[in-house]
A protein has these predicted regions:
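Phosphate/diphosphate-binding loops
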Residues: 86-87
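Flexible, glycine/proline-enriched loop segments at strand-loop-helix junctions
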Residues: 79-82, 137-141, 183
Length: 369
């Protein structure tokens, strides 16, 4: 993967210098598992590492200026992003101006500009960027989730530091959960990772996952991709939607059975609340479409001012499924509308929104599928 050796060299040096490293993740299932993989992996090789997962409402997606300022206050030397960062050029430049080292691990689409009929990547000024979607990255699988990119990074670091390769096996189940939960194509390498992860998930050593399986009455079930996508995964996602993703990270990092059981119960209850709110929002969106001129639009844009912003993407997905048209759901923000979109195979939301970037949004993040 492009920049892998450079990224390994950087952290090898930083660890030898006992520099403070901060992982900045994301609040969804891919971001939480990515953060956990990097946190555990870097701690294993002796890094002085901590983590920060942005709050969906208070912070928004990705790395923002106030997170750079906080890192400066905390005397952080090196920032490692996961499942975000590729579109944060201004924020990365801010970190660089403050003397920090920045390593991006991400899997989202690379921003670009059109020049003479060709797309030119617009990359942030990070010290190393691990993202297989970079045009000049030779890594063959362009459809990795963020957790697998993080896993690849830890694998390379383990090799450099002489950590036994068998220790990587503990991350397979996390890679599988993120791959299914972030809706990656289950082909080739992804399929192999998911198969291996599912085999290990039933007998996982992770106390948090053990208790989450128990809280959802799956102790005796043959756990499949369905259970990740529709039972366990939504519980991990629920905290980032309705509470704080730190709760899901705490579940994965739980040290006792009692702590794990409590957190698993909390997440399962949150997911039940999420289901009820999603159904209510979906019904309202359908009512609006069916009773207005929206039903004639090729791209459906529905405004639900009272909908929790974290549910916009799920509801947009349900609308897309019902009408087989690209769908956006916008919710009320303090100074602007916030929302999420889900598309169909023949329509690239990313490309269409890039065309009207100057007027349509302040930050763009879309699913990679």
């Amino acid at each position: 993967m492009k920049d892998m050796e450079k990224a390994v060299d950087i952290l090898e040096k930083k660890i030898s210098q006992k520099a403070k490293v901060r992982i900045i993740g994301d609040y969804d299932i891919d971001g939480v598992t990515s953060t956990y993989i990097l946190m555990k992996g870097l701690a294993r090789i002796g890094a002085d590492v901590d983590t920060y997962i942005p709050d969906r409402v208070a912070d928004g997606y990705g790395i923002h200026a106030h997170l750079i300022e906080r890192a400066e206050t905390d005397r952080i030397d090196t920032i490692v992003t996961c499942d975000n960062g590729i579109a944060a050029a201004a924020e990365i430049q801010m970190a660089k101006d403050k003397g920090m080292t920045v390593i991006i691990t991400d899997h989202h689409e690379v921003p670009y500009r059109e020049e003479k009929g060709e797309r030119q990547m617009v990359l942030p000024p990070a010290d190393a960027i691990l993202n297989p979607k970079q045009y000049d990255c030779p890594y063959p699988n362009k459809n990795l989730c963020g957790a697998v990119v993080a896993f690849k990074y830890i694998a390379a670091l383990y090799e450099r530091f002489g950590v036994p390769a068998e220790e990587l096996e503990d991350y397979y189940e996390l890679a599988a959960i993120a791959t299914v939960g972030d809706v990656m194509d289950l082909q080739g390498e992804n399929r192999i990772l998911v198969k291996e992860g599912l085999c290990r998930l039933k007998n996982t050593k992770n106390q948090g996952l053990q208790e989450l399986i128990r809280a959802n009455s799956l102790e005796d079930a043959k756990i499949t991709a369905y259970h990740i996508g529709f039972v366990l995964g939504p519980c991990i996602n629920a905290s980032g939607r309705l509470d704080t993703a730190a709760r899901s990270l705490a579940l994965l990092n739980a040290k006792t059975k009692e702590e794990a059981a409590r957190l698993a119960g909390d997440l399962t209850a949150l997911n039940q609340s999420r289901k009820a709110l999603t159904e209510k929002g979906k019904e309202e969106a359908i009512r609006i479409i069916e009773t207005t001129e929206l039903k004639n639009d090729r791209v459906l844009v529905v405004y639900l001012p009272d909908c929790h912003e974290s549910l916009a993407g799920i509801i947009a997905g349900r609308i897309r499924e019902k009408y087989h048209r690209p769908a956006f759901v916008l919710t009320g923000g303090e100074t602007s509308a916030k929302g999420s979109g889900r598309s169909i195979e023949s329509y690239s939301m990313y490309e269409e929104l890039v065309k009207c970037a100057a007027v349509s949004y302040t930050h763009l993040t879309l699913p990679t599928t």
